[in-house]
Structures are given as structure tokens and as C-alpha cells.
Regions:
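Short hydrophobic targeting helices and cationic amphipathic motifs
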Residues: 8-11, 20-25
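Short, charged beta-turn/beta-strand-edge "cap" motif at the junction between a beta-strand
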Residues: 433-435
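Conserved C-terminal guanine-recognition region of P-loop GTPase G domains, centered on the G4
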Residues: 138-288, 294-296, 304
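Canonical P-loop GTPase G-domain recognition
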Residues: 266-362
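Short acidic beta-strand-loop surface patches of small beta-rich interaction domains
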Residues: 406-422
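Conserved G1/Walker A P-loop phosphate-binding module
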Residues: 35-133, 137-164, 169, 174-175, ...
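Short, contiguous acidic and Ser/Thr-rich linear segments
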Residues: 376-388
Length: 435
């Protein structure tokens, strides 16, 4: 079973796969077979996929991670959160350096560096979740640790607000978003109220410490105090409406959202995507996606049946079964030709590089050969907040390196980097230290 030809893997995406495929998949899950044991240093971004029940969250998760999250056409298929690794993409500097890279904490495919990103697929959220309805309490706790949110809407309008199948086009896609927003804001307000009571009579720094589990910082609180002209000495004294507005602003600031309009190959998708863009485009951004098509293409690519670059594909295996060729032609016509791509990779890259404002920097020890001390060229791709300096890069690699840092060198220019200089995207940097 374990020596089953790899090109049969695409049959996973087909109905009624043969018994030996199911057996192979079962064995691989039980044995936890994995081909990715890389040491992912410097990678700490977490993206949460949220939405109502049965909107396609687990399919998107699987498409991003090539995971095996349960997928079914009924509510609350996901009970425990699924965790996995997806890969954001950036052009790798090895191309213009004319050196072959040797990635350690990432991958490189045809000149594109793939940087690992943590992804979380959580249980579907329904109205009343902040009061514990459905999987509400677990859902909101899972979201707390995330850095940004992909909010999934069903562009086909074929699932109701509770996740039950309904007549395509009958569900109002705007309500997919409104309910989630309402529940998030209600939950944040409740958290603020409870912790404001705990911080009664204390400094705002104490309030910030109580909210740190939501990745809320003192800078965030100072921001909201300033724009709403609130009293920083006593959070408990804030008026009810001020508390509500403050918690909403903090939620939007610390958990940026992008909307993914899923199932764009459906009859009503184009109308619903336009509707979402009209109401939410300026505020959140809306990405039309086809998660199931992305999953099928990635599995076919993994098995060597097609060559897929995240946008377009070409068939590389001769004599494919007619049903598979037909499925691929349908994806090409209904998704790629119409929408330009499945939208999934663009969605992930938007989260990392736009919503979270990250850049990629490549630390090396040998600035002549752009390598580490083992001679590996551009081994690590490190994500940093745009505006970071060399001391931030040193700390991301190891706290001791930051402590003993002397200076940094731009490996391409062979010039020392000023202490207060801001690093730029794609920069190759050597950190010089006393150790």
C-alpha cells in the first residue's frame, strides 16, 4: 500500500475512489506520514480561517496546507481546530544573485521562495456564539491567538446562516459577514468589560496586561485613548458607548480581516462577489476564490499529473483518465479563464504582506557567498514587520545574537547597515556579533 504510485493521489478529489486509495490514505493518517520536517525558525504568523458553518473553511484550509481536515455538507464538521502550514510566496533573491539557494526553513520553487505560515481552521460561528451557542466559546478562544483573519463567505448563496444546504442564490451573502462581525464585536466588548472591572483603580498598563492574550499591546490602547479622548487612568470610568467603540477599534486594529468569497464557479457568484465588494471592499478587501479547485490542482501537481504555479497549469502526464481531463478543463474554463486564478495564493499573500505588513529578509553569515557557516546559500527566509531594523532581525534569529550584536552588513552592497536604518524586503543581511 505504501508504495502505491504517487500519480493516483489526484483521485482523492474524485467521488468514489478505489478501496486501495482509501486504505492508503487511512494508513498515512494513522502513521502521521509527513514529508515536511523542516525547522521553521523565525516563523510565528498565525492566520485564522473563520466563517459560518459549512461555508468551505476546511476545504480552504486543505487547499492552503494540503491537509486532511474533515469536509462535509453539514454544519460543524470541524469540532476541534485544524492546524497546518501554508506557504506565502515571494521572489527569491537567488535568481538575481545567480546562486542556487539551499532553503532550510522554507522552500524555493522556480525562483519563488515559499515562506511557511501557520494556519488555523476553526469551528463555524453562528448567531449567539459570544453567549456560547454552537461552538462559540471554543471558536472565539481559537481566534484570540491569531494575527489576522480570513472571513469566508459562500458566494453561491447555497448554505443558510446555520450551515444547512438551501436553494442556490437564496442566502444573503452579506449576512455571512454581518453575523461574524457582530459576534466578534460582542465578544470583544464582553472581554473588555470583564477585564476593565479587574483593572478598576489600576493603571492602563495593568489593563493591557490582562488583554495580552488577544495580542493587544499598550500601543493599541494608547491609540484608542488618544482618538476617543478617553481617561487612561481609569478604564472602568469609560462610558458604555466609549467602551463599545474602543473594543471595536481594537478588534479591527489587532485582528485585520480579509473576506474570501468562496465557490466562485457557481451561478450566483459574480453577483454576490460584486455585492460583497460594494459593501465591504474598501473596509476589508474581497478576494473571489475557488477553494475546491485549488485543492484539486495542488493535489494533481503534487502527484506530478500537472505543472501548477498557483495561477495556471499544464497537463504533464499523458493518457490521464477522461474524467480527470474533463475536471481539469472545467476548472480552466470556469475559474482560471474567468477569474485569472483560484485566488487562494493571492489571498494568503495579501494576508501576510498587506494586512500584516510583513517583509522577507535573508540572514547569512558569509556575505561573499550569501551563505551560512555550512555553505548553504540563503538558507532562511525571515518574516519581519515592515520598518524593522537589524536589531529586530538579530532578535528574531536568537535573543543572544541581539544581545551581542555589533553591527549588520548588506551582503549585496558589501556595506555596513546603519544602526537606525530600516531593512527592506528581500534584503540579504549579515549580523556581526561578539560571539
Amino acid at each position: 500500500v505504501l508504495s502505491m504510485p504517487r500519480n493516483l493521489g489526484f483521485l482523492e478529489a474524485c467521488p468514489n475512489p478505489p478501496f486501495y486509495l482509501n486504505l492508503f490514505l487511512s494508513v498515512s493518517k494513522i502513521c502521521n506520514i509527513s514529508f515536511d520536517n523542516q525547522n521553521k525558525i523565525g516563523i510565528n504568523v498565525l492566520i485564522a480561517i473563520i466563517g459560518g458553518p459549512n461555508k468551505g473553511k476546511s476545504t480552504l484550509f486543505n487547499a492552503l496546507t494540503l491537509g486532511n481536515a474533515a469536509v462535509a455538507n453539514y454544519p460543524f464538521t470541524t469540532i476541534d481546530p485544524n492546524r497546518g502550514v501554508a506557504y506565502a510566496s515571494k521572489n527569491c533573491p537567488h535568481v538575481h544573485l545567480n546562486r542556487q539557494c539551499n532553503p532550510n526553513n522554507s522552500k524555493c520553487e522556480e525562483g519563488v521562495r515559499k515562506i511557511p505560515i501557520n494556519v488555523l481552521d476553526v469551528a463555524g460561528l453562528v448567531e449567539g456564539a459570544h453567549e456560547g451557542k454552537g461552538m462559540g466559546n471554543q471558536f472565539l478562544s481559537d481566534v484570540a491567538a491569531s494575527d489576522c483573519i480570513i472571513l469566508l463567505a459562500d458566494a453561491s448563496g447555497s448554505t443558510d446562516l446555520d450551515g444547512n444546504p438551501c436553494t442556490p442564490g437564496s442566502n444573503d451573502v452579506l449576512q455571512d459577514i454581518e453575523i461574524i462581525e457582530t459576534e466578534l464585536d460582542a465578544w470583544y466588548l464582553d472581554v473588555f468589560k470583564r477585564n476593565a472591572l479587574k483593572a478598576r483603580g489600576k493603571k492602563i498598563e495593568d489593563f493591557a496586561n490582562l488583554l495580552s492574550g488577544l495580542k493587544i499591546t499598550m500601543d493599541d490602547l494608547n491609540y484608542v485613548v488618544r482618538i476617543l479622548e478617553l481617561n487612561p487612568q481609569d478604564v472602568w470610568s469609560w462610558e458604555k458607548e466609549d467602551m463599545k467603540e474602543a473594543s471595536k477599534i481594537i478588534r479591527e486594529r489587532t485582528k485585520p480581516i480579509v473576506i474570501a468569497a468562496n465557490k466562485v464557479d457557481s451561478e450566483f457568484a459574480e453577483k454576490n462577489v460584486l455585492k460583497l465588494k460594494e459593501f465591504y471592499g474598501k473596509r476589508y478587501g474581497v478576494f473571489p476564490i475557488a477553494a475546491d479547485s485549488e485543492l484539486a490542482l495542488r493535489k494533481a501537481n503534487e502527484k506530478g499529473m500537472i505543472k501548477y504555479n498557483g495561477k495556471t497549469f499544464e497537463i504533464t502526464t499523458p493518457n490521464l483518465p477522461s474524467q480527470l481531463i474533463s475536471a481539469l478543463e472545467k476548472i480552466n474554463k470556469n475559474i482560471i479563464e474567468k477569474w485569472g486564478s483560484t485566488g487562494v495564493q493571492a489571498l494568503l499573500d495579501h494576508c501576510v504582506f498587506t494586512l500584516l505588513n510583513q517583509i522577507v529578509v535573508y540572514p547569512v553569515e558569509d556575505e561573499v557567498h550569501f551563505a551560512n557557516h555550512f555553505g548553504k546559500v540563503l538558507p532562511d527566509a525571515i518574516l519581519l514587520k515592515n520598518g524593522s531594523k537589524s536589531i529586530d532581525l538579530a532578535g528574531k534569529i536568537h535573543s543572544d545574537l541581539a544581545t551581542h550584536k555589533l553591527h549588520a552588513v548588506d551582503a549585496e552592497k558589501k556595506m555596513r547597515i546603519a544602526k537606525d536604518a530600516v531593512l527592506h524586503d528581500g534584503q540579504v543581511v549579515k549580523i556581526v556579533s561578539t560571539k
